[in-house]
């Protein structure tokens, strides 16, 4: 009986994660108390940070909330930080939690409008370079005001929808009936080459769209969660943030868009594949049927969502309230005027954001450990000991390298908190503090496109239903992101070092 119970517990521990991963996490949990007793809290604190970064890097094996949460519960039990310190961190960063709770849910109710826009662009533009540029620009613009995860989710929804239609037609089934999209056994030989080409076409569009969310997300206060966190620490509103970051974000945005066009024209790194004409004909016929069947209520819903989007942009620009509260207003407006009154439909809007919100609380627990043990103080002191003109570039590199393997919200939280503490202690002027804040913000946003680990939108794309269908693997995503990483990361460093 005891063996079966032990086996069942081992099997259920961290669910479907690989055995080696479960063993590593268990080893961490056993090792930490021993390290604390023998080597002290500072060494153990650094080990804990590395362990937590490991859980973020292995996000495809297991969502980091569970293993990271276990490590931080242990840290609390070992008194490496206190519940009171964690609560203070949460209070201090409450605007970020509000953003994730309400803004992401609010944008969920705009999905029909966003899906409508992306679908029109996909079928209305024949030039692949222009189409890719439009996807990148629209993703960047939307991510500057909305949530990058939601924008990515909309692009994925459009891609899944179009892929499903053509896959069913290629398999000889009704495009409006459910079928197994993950199997090509029934795909007719005539359509196989077109299907493979369509997969490559969708891969490139999705990558352009995902990069677009990073290009736009760095620009504004609400573009990424870490932006709001940094803006909150600095006391910047929407317009303030945009203007402070613009010397870096605007040149990088322009360079990113030029890169998008060049990749398509030169057909490098897996880009440049065109949509097969037979696929276009099938999708256009399907879209025409949808337009003809659209009801008056659905048309009204699109108008309401469009008006709500305009109100959202105006409210953000004028900073009439905290960002999360504006998101709550969007929820109320759209649901009230489109007749969504069922609490189960409302609840689905919060499903995407709440796991990451919970993970963010774990981030703040790690930050509380770092504060209490003063882990990053020597590193920040070393950076601040450099000549002032070298400090922004060095912080940018430090943030960029760590953000590429870890989560950029976590990295930004650590660095902005430590730099602000140095400012409070009188180690720098307000002007220099603002320069370092911009370096931290851009350092966590731009080089992190290198891997899916750094950008939540990239990780979301990699773990979505569309990735296996279009053969988008981790390695292929890194390869396709490489030119963007070099251009955005390199120009970002140059701008931070010489233009701020």
Curated annotation (Swiss-Prot):
Q: How does it sit in the membrane?
A: Multi-pass membrane protein
Q: What is this protein called?
A: Na(+)/H(+) antiporter NhaB
Where is this chain's protein located in or outside the cell?
Cell inner membrane
Q: Does the keyword Transmembrane helix apply?
A: yes
Gene Ontology annotations for the cellular component aspect, listed alphabetically = plasma membrane
- Which InterPro entries does the protein's record reference? Na+/H+_antiporter_NhaB
Pfam family of the protein (one): NhaB
What organism is recorded for this protein?
Answer: Pseudomonas entomophila (strain L48)
List membrane-spanning regions: 34-54, 58-78, 96-116, 129-149, 150-170, 205-225, 241-261, 311-331, 350-370, 394-414, 450-470, 477-497
Lineage summary: Bacteria, Pseudomonadati, Pseudomonadota, Gammaproteobacteria, Pseudomonadales
Under the GO molecular function aspect, what terms does this record hold? sodium:proton antiporter activity
Stated family: Belongs to the NhaB Na(+)/H(+) (TC 2.A.34) antiporter family.
UniProt keywords, alphabetically:
Antiport, Cell inner membrane, Cell membrane, Ion transport, Membrane, Sodium, Sodium transport, Transmembrane, Transmembrane helix, Transport
Provide the function of this protein: Na(+)/H(+) antiporter that extrudes sodium in exchange for external protons.
Does the keyword section mention Cell inner membrane?
yes
The record's catalysed reaction(s) read: 2 Na(+)(in) + 3 H(+)(out) = 2 Na(+)(out) + 3 H(+)(in)
């Amino acid at each position: 009986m005891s063996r079966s119970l032990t086996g069942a517990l081992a099997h259920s521990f961290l669910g479907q994660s690989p055995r080696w991963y479960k063993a590593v996490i268990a080893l961490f949990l056993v090792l930490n108390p021993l390290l604390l007793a023998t080597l002290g809290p500072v060494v153990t604190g650094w080990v804990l940070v590395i362990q937590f970064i490991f859980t973020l890097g292995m996000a495809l094996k297991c969502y980091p909330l569970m293993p990271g949460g276990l490590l931080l519960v242990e840290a609390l039990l070992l008194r490496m930080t206190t519940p009171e310190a964690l609560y203070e961190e949460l209070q201090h960063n409450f605007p970020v939690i509000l953003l994730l709770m309400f803004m992401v849910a609010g944008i969920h109710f705009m999905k029909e409008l966003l899906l409508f826009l992306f679908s029109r662009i996909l079928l209305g533009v024949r030039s692949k370079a222009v189409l890719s540029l439009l996807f990148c620009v629209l993703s960047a613009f939307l991510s500057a005001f909305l949530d990058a995860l939601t924008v990515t989710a909309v692009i994925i929804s459009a891609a899944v929808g179009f892929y499903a239609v053509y896959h069913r037609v290629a398999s000889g089934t009704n495009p409006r009936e459910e079928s197994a999209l993950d199997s090509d056994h029934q795909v007719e030989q005539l359509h196989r080459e077109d299907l493979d080409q369509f997969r490559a076409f969708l891969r490139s569009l999705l990558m352009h769209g995902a990069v677009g969310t990073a290009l736009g997300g760095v620009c504004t206060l609400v573009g990424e969660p870490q932006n709001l966190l940094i803006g909150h620490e600095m006391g910047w509103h929407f317009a303030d943030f945009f203007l402070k970051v613009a010397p870096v974000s605007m040149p990088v945005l322009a360079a990113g868009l030029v890169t998008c066009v060049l990749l398509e024209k030169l057909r490098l790194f897996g880009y440049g594949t065109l949509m097969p004409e037979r696929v276009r004909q099938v999708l256009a016929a399907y879209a025409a049927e949808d337009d003809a069947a659209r009801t008056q209520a659905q048309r009204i819903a699109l108008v309401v969502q469009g008006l709500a989007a305009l109100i959202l942009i105006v409210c953000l620009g004028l900073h009439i309230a905290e960002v999360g509260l504006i998101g709550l207003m969007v929820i109320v407006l759209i649901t009230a005027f489109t007749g969504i009154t069922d609490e189960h439909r409302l609840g689905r809007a919060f499903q995407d954001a709440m796991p990451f919100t919970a993970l963010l609380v774990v981030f703040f627990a790690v930050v509380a450990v770092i504060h209490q043990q003063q882990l990053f103080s020597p590193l920040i002191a070393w950076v601040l000991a450099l000549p002032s003109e070298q400090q922004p570039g060095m912080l940018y590199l430090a943030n960029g390298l760590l953000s590429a393997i870890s989560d950029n919200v976590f990295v930004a939280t650590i660095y902005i908190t430590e730099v602000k503490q140095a400012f409070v202690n009188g180690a720098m002027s307000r002007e220099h503090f603002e320069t370092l804040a911009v370096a931290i913000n851009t350092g966590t946003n731009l080089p992190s496109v290198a891997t899916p680990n750094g950008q939540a939108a990239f990780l979301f794309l990699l773990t979505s239903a569309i990735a296996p269908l279009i053969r988008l693997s981790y390695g292929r995503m890194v390869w396709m992101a490489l030119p963007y990483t070099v251009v955005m990361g390199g120009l970002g460093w140059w701008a931070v070092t010489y233009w701020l």
